Amino acid sequence: MKQERRRKRQPGPPRLELVVAHPREEEMAGLDGGGDAEEGATHARGGGGAPPPWREQLTARGLVASLAVGAMYSVIVMKLNLTTGLVPTLNVSAALIAFVVLRGWTQALARLGFAARPFTRQENTVVQTCAVACYSIAVGGGFGSYLLGLNKRTYEMAGEDTEGNVPGSYKEPGIAWMTGFLLAVSFVGLLALVPLRKVMIIDYKLTYPSGTATAVLINGFHTPHGDAMAKQQVNGFTKYFAMSFFWSFFQWFYSGGDNCGFSQFPTFGLKAWQQTFFFDFSLTYVGAGMICSHLVNLSLLLGAILSWGVMWPLISDLKGDWYSADIPESSMKSLQGYKAFICVALILGDGLYNFVKIVALTIKNLFDSSKLKNAKKGEDMPVLDELHRNEVFTTDNIPSWLAFSGYLGLTFIAVIAIPMMFHEMKWYYVVIAYLLAPALGFCNAYGAGLTDINMAYNYGKIALFILAAWAGKDSGVVAGLVGCGLVKSLVSISADLMHDFKTGHLTLTSPRSMIIAQAIGTVMGCVISPLTFFLFYSAFDIGNPEGYWKAPYALVYRNMAILGVEGFSALPQHCLQLCYGFFGFAVAANLTRDLCPPKYGRWVPLPMAMGVPFLVGASFAIDMCIGSLIVFTWHIIDKSKAALMVPAVASGLICGDGLWIFPASLLALAKISPPMCMAFRSTN
C-alpha cells in the first residue's frame, strides 16, 4: 500500500523552463498544498534514526559525483541553449543520476570487499543540490541570450545601421571576463534570503512544488521498495542512454556538409522541408518532449504552423511592398525583423501578465497569511514528524552576521569589477540593483513557493528596458543587456535556494550543508560553463540563423535593448501593428486560461511556447510532439509503468544525444569532417 501511495506521488515530468516557466497541471495536482507531499516524505523516511551531522553529509565522493553530473548536464543544457533556447528542468533527472552514481560506487566497493560509508538520503540531497547549482549557471548564465547578445555577430545581425545599435556596442566572448562576471553576480543571491529561510519554509509553509517533488523522489529511493524501483529506472536510463549516444554517432557519418544528414531528412516532402517542417531525428528534443507537458508541446506546434506555415510565406510575398526587395531576408529591416519583434511581443505580453499576476498573488497571500496567523494562533499543533523536521532545519543555523557581511563584501566587489568589464555599466547602476535585490528576491522566492514559477527572466527584462532607456543611445544596449543579467542572476538564485531548502527540510538535510553545496556547485558552474560554451563557440557556427546553432535569444535580447533605447522607430513597416496584436493575444490567452473553468482553460495555448518557433523553425516542435505522443501512448498501455519510467527514459535520450556533442566538438576542432553527405533533391 505504501509503495502504491509513493508511486502515485511520483513526480510527473517537470515543466519546461521557458523565459517564464509555466507549471504543469499534472505536477501541481500531485503536489499542491504541502500536507500530502510532506506526508509522503515522512512515510518514505523509514528507519527514523537521527540524520548524520552536516559535515558527514558533505563527502569527497559526493563532490566528485556532483562535479561529474554537473559537468555532463552543463554540456547538455548548453547545447539546448545554443540551438532553440528551450531547457526543460532536469532536477528529477539529476537526482536520479546522482543516486545511480553513488549507489553504484558503494555497491562496487562492497563487492570488492571494502567497507564504504552508507549512502544516505541526506548525501543524495547534497549531491543533487550541488550538481543542479553547477549546471544552473549554464542554463541561466546568459550564454544563449544576454551575454551572447553582446558579441559582434549579433550586433551585425541586428543591423549596423539600426538606430540605437551604435558602432562598437559589442564585446566578444572571453573565458576570463565571462568567468569573472559570473563569479561577481552569482553568489549574492545565495546570501540575500538566508536569514528568511525559516520564515519562508516553516512559518509561511510555502510548498515549493519542484523542491517537494525532488524530496519525495529522493526519499522514495532510500527505502527497501525504493531500491527495486530505482533499479528499473537505472536500467531504463542506461538502455536509452546507450541507444541515443550510438544513434548520434551513426548520424555523424552522413552529415558532411550543409543541409546534410538525418537532421535534414525531408519527412513530409521538400516543400514542407523548405518551411522547416520535418523530423530531424534529434533524440534530445524527443526526450525533452517526454518531460514537458502536452500543452507546451502542442503550443510549440501551433506556433510553428502559425508562423512558418502561414505568416512568413505571406509576408515573403509582400517583399518589395512592406520591405525592400534589395536587402537579404536575414536583415532586421527585412523578414528577420518581423520574426524577431513578433516573438518579442509574445514574450513581453506573456511575461508582463505573469509578472503582474504573481506580484498580486504574492501580496494577497502575504496579507491573508498574516490575518490567518493571528486568527489561528494556538489552534494548530504541529505533528511530531513536522516538529522533527523543523528542529533539524533550525539546528545548523547560518549566522545572520555572516550573511549580511558576505552580502556587503560581494556587493563591494561587484561595484568595482562590473564597471571595469563594461564601461557602459555605471557603478551606481550596480549599487541600485544590489540594494533592490533582497526585496526582488523575496517577491520572486515567495511567488515561486506558491506557484512554482520562477519570474527571474521577467525581472531581468524589466531591468533591461529601464537601464537601456536610462543609459541612452551611446551606452543603452550594453548597459541593458548586462543589467538584465545582473538582476536576473540575483533574483533567480534566491528562488533556487529556497527550492533546495524545501528539499532539505523534507529529507532532514542540514541547511548548512545545503548552502555550502550550493556555493561549491556555483563555483564549479562559474568555471565549467564558460569552458563548455567556448568548446561549442570554437567548434560550431554559433548564431547562424540559417544553421543548426541558431541561439535565437541572443538576437531577441539585443532587439529588446534596442527597443529600450529607440522605442518603436526600430521596427520594420507594419511590424508595430502586428506586435500590438500578438502582445494583446498573449495577455488575452493568459486571462482566458485563468478565468475559464480548468477543464476548458487547460486547453488554451501558452503564448511563450508559441513564440519560440517563430525564430527557430518547426522541426524541433515536431520532435517535441513525438515525445508527447510516446508518453500519451505509454500511459494508455500501462499508466503505472509510464509514471515510473518516463523520466528515466527521457533522461537517457537527452543525456546520450547531449553527451555525443563533446566528441563531435573535439572532432570539429581537429578539422575531422564526416565522410559522407546524405542530401535530397527533387526529381524535377
Swiss-Prot record:
GO terms for biological process: response to iron ion; seed development. Residues 1-55 are annotated as: Disordered. The chain crosses the membrane at residues 58-78, 82-102, 130-150, 174-194, 234-254, 295-315, 341-361, 402-422, 430-450, 462-482, 515-535, 568-588, 612-632, 642-662. One of its GO terms (cellular component) is plasma membrane. Keywords: Membrane, Transmembrane, Transmembrane helix, Transport. It comes from the Eukaryota. It is found in: Membrane. It holds the Pfam family OPT. Residues 1-10 have a biased composition (Basic residues). One of its GO terms (molecular function) is oligopeptide transmembrane transporter activity. It is a multi-pass membrane protein. Belongs to the YSL (TC 2.A.67.2) family. May be involved in the transport of nicotianamine-chelated metals. This is Probable metal-nicotianamine transporter YSL9. It comes from Oryza sativa subsp. japonica. The gene is YSL9.
